[in-house]
Amino acid sequence: MIGIIGAMDMEVNGLKERMQNAEVETIGTIDFYKGTIQGVPCVVARSGVGKVNAAICAQIMALMYRPKAII
């Protein structure tokens, strides 16, 4: 699984549109979209702007979904 984090909607909307079999899970205030993009298992999230928001989102993603990489 690959984790992808964007700060704003415009950074993740295209990925969410291309995602197949998407399931949404909300943890705290962050929506995580889990599915596949071109057959690759992915989880996509919008963290919000800022280093702290990105770090919180990355930590939750790492603990809950165990991706091989986070972009």
Where are these regions (language model features)?
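Accessory terminal and edge-of-domain segments that mediate assembly/interaction
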Residues: 1-71
